[in-house]
Amino acid sequence: MNTAAASTSTPSRDALARFVLEGAAVRGAVVSLDATLRDILGGHPYPPALVRALAEFAAAAALLASTLKFKGSLVVQLASEGPVRLAVVECDASLGLRATAQWRDEAGALPADATLAVLVGDL
């Protein structure tokens, strides 16, 4: 089993922007976590498929935390018996992010575009 962990606060190069489509009942938000993801992922031997999953979890956590008014932390977590045993991303009310992951050796052989079902061994 392999394990890696990292934490960071929201750096200045990251961005979160809300938008409204005029004339339509559509509003949303977009997030860019370039610097934060570099800090979280850098220096850790995450398999490519796990890098993608952690990036998606971090974006989801940041978007959800930005729309909720709360004190505390929001956690996005995956736990499985598959190639990825555990992937956790935590986002606090100030949008600080941290992440950790544990994976089995076979996760390194997965393609970078492996689906979530493949990561959890649900095929």
Predicted feature locations:
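N-terminal functional module of multi-domain proteins
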Residues: 2-3, 11-122
